[in-house]
Structure formats: C-alpha cells, structure tokens
Amino acid sequence: MFLTRTEYDRGVNTFSPEGRLFQVEYAIEAIKLGSTAIGLKTKEGVVLAVEKRITSPLLEPSSVEKIMEIDEHIGCAMSGLIADARTLVEHARVETQNHRFSYGEPMTVESTTQALCDLALRFGEGDEESMSRPFGVSLLIAGHDENGPSLYYTDPSGTFWQCNGKAIGSGSEGADSSLQEQFNKDLTLQEAETIALSILKQVMEEKVTPNNVDIAKVAPTYHLYTPSEVEAVISRL
C-alpha cells in the first residue's frame, strides 16, 4: 500500500510513486518568493545585479548582502533563504582556499560550483545530523579562470548549468524572456551592466536606487560596486 502524499512530503530522501522528491520541489518553489537576481556573461567578464528588499526605513541597506565573494576570481548572487546561501558560500570559500593551498593555483569556477552542489545534495555537512531539508536557495556563480569568464546557475536539487545569461527569484520569468531578447555574444561589460539593471528595473516594484540594488562584476577579479558606481549605472538607463 502506498504512503499518503503527506508522508512523501516529509521524507526528504523518499521518492513518491511518480518518482518525485516533494521537499526538493518545494525548495525550488521557495526561490520564486525571493528577490530577483540577474547574471550576464560577456567576453570581458560577468555582471551580477540583484534587488535588495529594504523592508523598513530603519534597516541599514549596506547590511543586506545579496552578492558575496567566494574567491578573488569568483562571486555569487543569491535568491531564497540567505542563511542557507551563507552556509553554501562558507563551504565554497573553504574549498577554494584549500585548493589554492594544496595546488598553488586558483580553483576553476566549474570545480567550485561542483563542490557547492555536492553539499547541496547532502543537505548539510559534518558528523552532526544532516539538515532535514534541502537548501532553499538558488545561486548565480560568476567567475573568471583559465577558460575565460563563466556563469553558472545552481538550484536546491544540487543541479548546475552553465549559462550566458540567467535570472532567478520572484521576477525571473519576465527577466529571463527579456534577457533572451537582449543578449548577444558581443556585448561589452558596460552594456551588460545597463541591460541587467534595466531588466531589474522592469521587474522591481519600486524605483531603482543605489540602496535597493547591488551590482558586482568579475573581470577578471571580483568587484562589488560602491553606491556611487551603482548611481553611475542608474544614470545611464
């Protein structure tokens, strides 16, 4: 006799008779509630742009981190549960530093993404009890290594894809279709900044300001834009 749907819902390691892992599917749905993040790859480097939801005028905007540095040549933007993202980013930072220490060279972007997804698939690490649920976060990982610039997208199932452009979060459907229309392989980094921010402006419910968006680039090293640099990109829209 089959278990009820609710019992399949609870078991993170139990497939339903239709071959589905409901907890992973729910985690993927949770990301659609998160703030929108956009990544765009060019020949010069990769641009990341993220919406920051400032829920109260008492909140310090600089404390809301939606783009983080993993290594000097890799950065990542996130949508979903930020605490989960922090766990994954910390793991990736340790992996990249261990690789640099052991081999005397930076870790490739693909290997870093693979290490992140291995952890996502285990739902946690260490000898303590593993997490009882998947990580409720999607990441856009931007990097620059011996293979040139690259952009990867990860989801809670531990799957990753390499992309030229990708949007995640609540406005991802509209943003993805706009990216498809505007992307071409000959974009400059400056054009990519403008496109990413203009698409973000379309899907955001409020006016774009340096306080409610973050922009970063990896070209070839990671750089998070200052509020005045973000203002300069906004003025070009």
Curated annotation (Swiss-Prot):
The keyword Cytoplasm applies. SUPFAM superfamilies: N-terminal nucleophile aminohydrolases (Ntn hydrolases) (SSF56235). GO terms for biological process: proteasome-mediated ubiquitin-dependent protein catabolic process. Its main location: cytoplasm. Gene3D superfamilies: Glutamine Phosphoribosylpyrophosphate, subunit 1, domain 1 (3.60.20.10). The proteasome is a multicatalytic proteinase complex which is characterized by its ability to cleave peptides with Arg, Phe, Tyr, Leu, and Glu adjacent to the leaving group at neutral or slightly basic pH. The proteasome has an ATP-dependent proteolytic activity. Pfam families: Proteasome (PF00227), Proteasome_A_N (PF10584). PANTHER family: PROTEASOME SUBUNIT ALPHA/BETA (PTHR11599). It is found in: Cytoplasm; Nucleus. This is Proteasome subunit alpha type-5. Belongs to the peptidase T1A family. InterPro entries: Ntn_hydrolases_N, Proteasome_alpha, Proteasome_alpha-type, Proteasome_alpha_type_5, Proteasome_asu_N, Proteasome_sua/b. The keyword Mitochondrion does not apply. It comes from the Eukaryota. One of its GO terms (cellular component) is proteasome core complex, alpha-subunit complex. The 26S proteasome consists of a 20S proteasome core and two 19S regulatory subunits. The 20S proteasome core is composed of 28 subunits that are arranged in four stacked rings, resulting in a barrel-shaped structure. The two end rings are each formed by seven alpha subunits, and the two central rings are each formed by seven beta subunits. The catalytic chamber with the active sites is on the inside of the barrel. Keywords: Cytoplasm, Nucleus, Proteasome. It comes from Glycine max.
